């Protein structure tokens, strides 16, 4: 796994520290610019705050109908410019700003045009950076990268840790964990970005284009590059697994196409859509359990004189459970054949998101740079320590808020101070988020804060009395793990909601339909982990190629079924008993068409070449993706009128 870790940014802590420091500075700039913090969406409905951010003595409720720039026609979008409320403001007039001196005055007079987000990015760009547009582009661009980093880092350092612990506590077989918790860990950024687009920002078309765009990218570009990398290695792919995965994926896309054609979804339809993955996961788990059980029965009839890993008595299915890079000649101290491992290898848990992890960074620096005797003659140890302290200081604004609210019980990163603080502040954060909902009275908010503080104080006291400074708790682990799991989801939602709001802002600045940005920028950003990890796995050869290609199809299928399925379920639940209307975007059918064509291309080319990936398959898939991106961008810019 060292080859994989080397490709990640873990071996470059100085760059990571500088990047995190720059992101922290931008964060402080946004906070400083947000002089009117009570106008952000999380607090915009406080009954004692008026539209200008000043306290209202009469405590009268102030509400304003929100409207996104992307709800109007911008280079191919299909919305109209009429508001459902009493206001008749057309936010599409931002660039012309007729009747106003500039865009800043337009936004100040029409606050409903600002996209939902903690920070008002449009006002920051057009007002604070009015005379320094280049600086505004740079700051927003770096912050976009930072949000992608935070989304992936939360998955790698918090969410996957909780999933791994949960799998061990529940004693899930590796086959079951491999089709349930593992895809959730690797696909968490896509899933929660989709949910945030549907529920948080009410921009369902961004979520749809992000998930489907990521699926096209992974199944075409990543599979294409993997095919090119292993074309000369004559690696053979399991035919049954390949056909099974692609058949389920094609059925999923057909079902999604039917839902999009109908244009509306109910809670029952959303549950049925998610249940496709439940059936798929059950089938995979049952098949693997039966296969390994039959292998065990065969092994029982053969008793080798010297059981060893990789011997002639070991079947391929048994070796699948032996960790990578384990010794070839390792004697078994027990009797009989080698026993199967009861958990997934640790490195698999953050395969697709480990590129964002800080844990790998700390481990690699410690393992590779520190000499065995613990000191150096040239004072490099002091320099490394100083660099580490500076890096940690720069990372503080991005890491401390999450550490203070996400409970972790990792051996390497255990801290009683953070543990007590996290269980104390997590309920307060949940109370804050709940009280920021629409149509919540002042009395309900006060009660919510009181309950959050009371629960947090109680949990903090219990954690302080029942934990030790030098090691994590050994009892009551499930509440700790579930707490980390839930709070990781909360942070996912917050970061993903901000990411979608920033993409909507870029759509308003450039006059581009935000769904195109979801199809490209958001999809590419969330798929970088798949690209790096799957290529690295395939370069190792052997089972790595099978794992990489399986992930290229199982991952997007999970994101489509669970990500979009849960998004539609939450959207339908919020509109219940009425049906949830899916945002109309005819371009989604073109995306589905290209995605289906790419799957059929792979389904035809691999069996024709005896299940060996070759250059023809890889070049064909990459060419198909380039045609797809060119077609979608051209149609968005109006060069292909019939496709707009």
Swiss-Prot record:
Pfam families per UniProt: Na_Ca_ex (PF01699)
Compartments (UniProt record): Membrane
GO molecular function, one term: antiporter activity
Tissue specificity annotation: Expressed in roots, leaves, stems, flowers and pollen.
Membrane topology classification: Multi-pass membrane protein
Entry keyword annotation includes Transport: yes
Single Gene Ontology BP annotation: sodium ion transport
Main localization of the protein described in the UniProt heading: membrane
Gene3D superfamilies recorded: NCX, central ion-binding region
Membrane spanning residue stretches: 17-37, 132-152, 179-199, 211-231, 241-263, 268-290, 414-434, 444-464, 475-495, 499-519, 553-573, 587-607, 619-639
InterPro entries, A to Z: CaCA_antiporter, NaCa_Exmemb, NCX_ion-bd_dom_sf
Result of knocking out the encoding gene: No visible phenotype.
Disulphide-bridged cysteine pairs: none
Keyword annotations: Antiport, Ion transport, Membrane, Potassium, Potassium transport, Sodium, Sodium transport, Transmembrane, Transmembrane helix, Transport
The organism's place on the tree of life at top rank: Eukaryota
Gene Ontology CC terms: membrane
Entry function: Membrane-localized H(+)-dependent K(+) and Na(+) transporter.
UniProt family annotation: Belongs to the Ca(2+):cation antiporter (CaCA) (TC 2.A.19) family. Cation/calcium exchanger (CCX) subfamily.
Designated name of the protein: Cation/calcium exchanger 4
Species, as recorded: Arabidopsis thaliana
């Amino acid at each position: 796994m060292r080859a994989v870790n080397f490709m990640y940014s873990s071996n470059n802590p100085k760059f990571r520290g500088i990047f995190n420091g720059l992101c922290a500075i931008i964060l402080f700039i946004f906070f400083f610019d947000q002089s009117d913090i009570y106008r952000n969406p999380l607090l915009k409905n406080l009954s004692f705050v008026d539209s200008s951010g000043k306290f209202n003595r009469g405590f009268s409720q102030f509400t304003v109908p929100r409207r996104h720039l992307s709800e109007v026609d911008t280079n191919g979008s299909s919305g109209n410019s009429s508001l459902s409320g009493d206001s008749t403001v057309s936010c599409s007039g931002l660039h012309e700003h007729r009747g106003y001196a500039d865009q800043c005055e337009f936004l100040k007079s029409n606050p409903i045009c600002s996209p939902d987000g903690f920070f008002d990015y449009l006002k920051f760009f057009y007002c604070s950076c009015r005379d320094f547009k280049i600086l505004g582009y740079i700051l927003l661009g770096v912050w976009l990268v930072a949000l992608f980093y935070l989304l992936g880092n939360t998955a790698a350092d918090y969410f996957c840790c909780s999933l791994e612990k949960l799998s061990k506590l529940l004693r899930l077989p590796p086959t079951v964990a491999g089709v349930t918790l593992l895809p959730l860990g690797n696909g968490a950024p896509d899933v929660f970005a989709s949910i945030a687009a549907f529920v948080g920002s009410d921009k369902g078309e961004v979520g749809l284009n992000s998930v489907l765009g990521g699926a096209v990218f992974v199944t075409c570009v990543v599979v294409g590059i993997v095919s090119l990398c292993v074309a000369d290695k004559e690696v053979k792919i399991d035919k049954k697994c390949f056909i099974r995965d692609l058949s389920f994926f094609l059925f999923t896309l057909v079902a999604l196409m039917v839902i999009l054609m109908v244009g509306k979804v109910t809670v029952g339809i959303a549950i049925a859509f998610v249940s496709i993955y439940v059936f798929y996961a059950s089938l995979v788990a049952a098949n693997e359990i039966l296969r390994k059980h039959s292998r065990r029965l065969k092994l029982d009839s053969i008793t080798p004189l010297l059981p060893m890993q990789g011997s002639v008595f070991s079947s391929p299915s048994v070796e699948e459970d032996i960790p990578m890079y384990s010794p070839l000649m390792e004697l078994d101290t027990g009797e009989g054949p080698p026993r199967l491992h009861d958990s997934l290898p640790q490195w698999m848990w953050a395969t697709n998101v480990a590129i964002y992890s800080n844990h790998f960074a700390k481990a690699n620096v410690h393992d590779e740079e520190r000499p065995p005797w613990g000191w150096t003659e040239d004072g490099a140890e002091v320099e490394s320590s100083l660099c580490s302290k500076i890096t940690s200081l720069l990372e503080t604004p991005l890491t401390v808020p999450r550490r203070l609210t996400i409970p972790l019980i990792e051996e390497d990163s255990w801290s009683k101070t953070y543990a007590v603080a996290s269980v104390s502040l997590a309920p307060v954060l949940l109370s804050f988020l709940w009280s920021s909902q629409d149509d919540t009275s002042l009395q309900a908010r006060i009660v919510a804060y009181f309950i959050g503080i009371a629960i947090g104080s109680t949990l903090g006291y219990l954690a302080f009395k029942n934990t030790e400074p030098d090691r994590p708790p050994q009892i009551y682990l499930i509440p700790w793990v579930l707490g980390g799991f839930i709070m990781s989801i909360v942070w996912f939602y917050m970061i993903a909601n901000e990411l979608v709001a920033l993409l909507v802002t870029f759509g308003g600045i450039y006059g581009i339909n935000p769904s195109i940005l979801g199809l490209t920028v958001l999809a590419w950003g969330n798929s970088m982990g798949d690209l790096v990890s799957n290529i690295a796995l395939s370069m190792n050869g052997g089972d790595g190629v099978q794992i990489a290609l399986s992930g290229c199809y199982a991952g997007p299928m999970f994101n489509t079924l669970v990500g979009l399925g849960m998004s539609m379920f939450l959207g339908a639940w919020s509109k219940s008993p009425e049906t949830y209307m899916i945002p109309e975007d005819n371009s989604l059918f073109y995306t589905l068409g290209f995605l289906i064509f790419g799957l059929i291309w792979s389904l035809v080319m691999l069996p024709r070449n005896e299940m060996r990936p070759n250059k023809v398959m890889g070049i064909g898939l990459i060419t198909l993706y380039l045609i797809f991106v060119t077609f979608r961008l051209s149609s968005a810019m109006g060069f292909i009128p019939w496709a707009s």
